[in-house]
Amino acid sequence: MSKSQIDDSRANCRNLKNIIIVNSDTSKLLEYSIALNDKEIDFCINTINGRYPEKGYCTNEKCKEICYVLDENGTINKKEEKIEFNQGDVILIDKEEVYYWDGNCKIIMICTPAWYKEQCKLLEI
């Protein structure tokens, strides 16, 4: 990799792709996505305050997520299992796994392939 390619990669990592804010009566989700310009992987930092989604569950039809808890704590409630997490924990969410978040925390999420909203589905179960 050339020096210019390394510099380009570093510049891409510093560029915010988008900021998503979801507010409801019971939850707040703040997401910072980084423009990696790579369809195979992406990175974001989510701040979750409350339950997300507010009702039901969500699932990613295409993406697998590795989540690292930066601070605070909470639970991820999978269809068959409730997992408590704390700062420093790592959580794997497989594609097509059904879940919802509940807590007050900041989480780094790495998705492969890169996350896109059309493949994320909200479910009322």
Question: What residue ranges belong to the model's regions?
Answer:
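A short, N-terminal "cap"/entry segment at the start of jelly-roll beta-barrel domains
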Residues: M1-G50, E54-Y57, L123-I125
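Short acidic-glycine-tyrosine-enriched beta hairpin
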Residues: K79-E96
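Short, conserved beta-strand element in jelly-roll/cupin
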Residues: T59-I76
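Short strand-coil-strand connectors
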Residues: N37, N77-E81, N104
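Conserved hydrophobic/aromatic positions in well-ordered beta-strands
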Residues: C44-N46, C67, I108
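A generic fold-level signal
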Residues: S24, D38-E40, E61, F85, ...
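Short hydrophobic/aromatic-rich beta-strand segments that constitute the beta-sheet cores
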Residues: I76-K78, M109-I110
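Ligand-binding loop in jelly-roll beta-barrel domains
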Residues: K95-C120
